[in-house]
Amino acid sequence: MVIANSNIIFVAGLGGIGLDTSREIVKSGPKNLVLLDRIDNPAAIAELKALNPKVTVTFYPYDVTVPLAETKKLLKTIFDKLKTVDLLINGAGILDDNQIERTIAVNFTGLVNTTTAILDFWDKRKGGPVGVVANICSVTGFNSIYQVPVYSASKAAALSFTTSIAKLAHITGVTAYSINPGITKTVLEHSFNSWLNVEPRVAELLLEHPTQTTLQCAQNFVKAIEANQNGAIWKLDLGRLDAIEWTKRWDSGI
């Protein structure tokens, strides 16, 4: 996918990996970058606008845990304004296994609902122009960090959902791939709670391992966007971008 002159919606593109990715996207010259986030960040938005004045950067408040109908209403506002959207990036995520319901609501249900909502506008069966979904999942969707099983399970679910959406492309026309960062130096990793406090030092222990910066992750994210491979499972770890070959253990046969 060519980022230049495209219209992109980025959910949670104002912090951590998201903000650095927004910076890299803006440098590539999209026509519009629409940021949907729960918390406004005027300084970051001003920075993005200044980084490339030719790009129209807009912000809408959005909590991914709202009902599906509210998400559809917001997307209608955006589509009415832009007419077309080329790429949806779902990046909302929390890491706190003390908040079980919210972890699942943000990391999985919110991603599912936002993707489902945009199909109203993209699905070729409804005469839609189709589009691309990039879902930020996690390497914990491959193998869990067992001290944070709720977070890991939510990311595994998001990965499975994304893979299914990709396989439905021949029906809907909508393609999808997953972005799976490894341990990255973000606010999420600085301090978080393990499930039932089984490991109070889990954040500290993770950061003792080799990590990557948010900028390294963002630069590889943009490479994945440009590659635009339907069904790709991208691992963004240690400053590298690698496509994962998923081992098939079972097949429904349908």
Curated annotation (Swiss-Prot):
Keywords: NAD, Oxidoreductase
Single biological process term from Gene Ontology: alcohol metabolic process
Family, similarity comment: Belongs to the short-chain dehydrogenases/reductases (SDR) family.
Keyword Oxidoreductase set for record: yes
GO cellular component: cytoplasm
Gene3D superfamilies: NAD(P)-binding Rossmann-like Domain
EC number: 1.1.1.1
UniProt name for this protein: Alcohol dehydrogenase
Disulfide bonds: none
Organism: Drosophila hawaiiensis (Fruit fly)
Catalytic activity: a primary alcohol + NAD(+) = an aldehyde + NADH + H(+); a secondary alcohol + NAD(+) = a ketone + NADH + H(+)
Record-annotated active site: 151 (proton acceptor)
Residues annotated to bind NAD(+): 10-33
Gene Ontology MF terms in the entry: alcohol dehydrogenase (NAD+) activity
Keyword GTP-binding: no
Pfam family name, one: adh_short
